[in-house]
Amino acid sequence: MELGAWRSILYIAFLFAITRHAFCKAVNLVHSPEGEEFENILSSVSATVEKKEVNNKLIMPTANRDNQGVREELLVSSFKERKLLNTNSANLRLNSIGSYEMIDFKQINSEFFLSHRQHGFVLFIDSKKKPRQSFYTDSATSIVQLSKKYRNKIKFKSVDCASSLEKCEEIGINSFPSLVYYNNAGQKKVFTAHTPYEVLSKHADLITELDETDGKVYPQSIIRLEEFKNLKANEPVFFLYLHDYGSTPEDFDSLRIFARYLVGFAPLYRTDDEKVIKTLNVTRLPHLVAIRHGVAFSYSERSVSAMRNTFQLIKWASLLKYPLVPELTPAVVENLDSDSYLAIALINPTSQVKASKAISTVQEIGLKWTLKLREVERKQLLTAREKWWDHLRMLKQKGYDDVAFLAAEYSLPLPKNKKVTFVWVNSLQWKTWISHTFHIDPMGPSRFVLMDPSRMFYWDSSAKGLPLTLDDSSLILDTTFRVLAITGEGLPHEFSIPRGYVYLSEIKQYSSLILISLWISLILFVSFLNRRLILHYSFESVHQLKTLTRKFIYSSLLKQD
């Protein structure tokens, strides 16, 4: 092989190395720690969610945190925290060995825990790991106190993950010790060594209260109109069961199971007060509503069997048990619809006072959106109803005999609006993902971004080109209506580029180098081809050209003759 061919091969290898380096750089930019976790969260609509939560205790107290109590998210978030908590304490086992019944890991997924009637705490430990931090003893004390106080009221069991660590991680146990409450609906809530005893105690009190009402009507107390108004003003989320004298014990049994699912999120009340029923415009009983920041969300099913279907109730309340604008966590994402847009509020937590105020503002924006959307949908329903009546009049004018039958076949043209969920995230935790995806300074003022997770499009400005900040809620609402095409108006002028293109643009500094390498390789490859072959084709071309020229001259001379 000639020297020129070897040079061509070397230049091609050099070009391949440069291209591979640029591609790896782009992959590293996409899969940064924060970006990978948040991408899993937004894609959870269709992908697997990482088994970790956001630790709000390390950031700031959220709005109405005092009222939420056990609704605080106190789970482990970072690798550093996991490393600190991946310990086991002999004191914990000695002090609480009498309160916890050791069970095998296989029993976790058995019918025992999947049964509707079994519930209680399960302590996950790892006997192979030794204590590493002195604070662990204090953290374990809260677990020990809980088991001593409620050992005769709540079931306590223990699982050693030493022999099945991977299986424990699959069910979301990433730190030890972890105390998990399994309710009788198959759901679980994880508490770690970060969780204070007060939070554990409040959670256990609610469980004990439910246990004491077995066989009785639950909820036991009936609220009246004044109490209902106080709850609307003070409770961010609560559920209300409206009934009359016709309710049976079976109805309240399903409510008791439903209440266990709501433990730690929202309380459940009941009423037969006609004033409350009239206030909520309810015409058929029994009826179940969720009140979120004063706005009622009704359970659409009205039949008695549907009201007793616990799993159907749990599915309906999966997202309604959170505040109107919750923090985006894996638990929230699991309950989102796959076709739902996301209105993400990027909250800057550097100032605790400003952050709390921003979260309150986000809740107000979510409330305005809900009320405005209901107003628009009411108009859409009235328009659809008018179209149906026009169709009925048209049938009568044509003289059809079976007008009622034909009208029944014509379905009411109900509006099919796109869904959107308002959430907020901590811009400090996700600063890398925010800066790479949206090209927004995460440490800047808090702002809004509308996102379509299915196509990975986003909108960060209004139709006038103004950024979507929390100061102007009207711009946020107007842009949301435009993006969802609910009001029929056009999209914002500042349309964002696809997320995939955003990632590709991160390697634009390598584009000139890649182009130069391509041109050099192409020139060298052509120049070092077999010279004999090039000369052969060149001589053959010259010979053909001469032949054609002679033929042209002879033909022209013959024409002259």
Swiss-Prot record:
One of its GO terms (cellular component) is endoplasmic reticulum membrane. Its main location: endoplasmic reticulum. One of its GO terms (molecular function) is protein disulfide isomerase activity. One of its GO terms (biological process) is ERAD pathway. This is Uncharacterized protein C1840.08c. Residues 1-24 form the signal peptide. The chain crosses the membrane at residues 510-530. Residues 25-509 are lumenal. It comes from Schizosaccharomyces pombe (strain 972 / ATCC 24843). Residues 531-561 are cytoplasmic. Keywords: Endoplasmic reticulum, Golgi apparatus, Membrane, Signal, Transmembrane, Transmembrane helix. The lineage of its organism: Eukaryota, Fungi, Dikarya, Ascomycota, Taphrinomycotina.
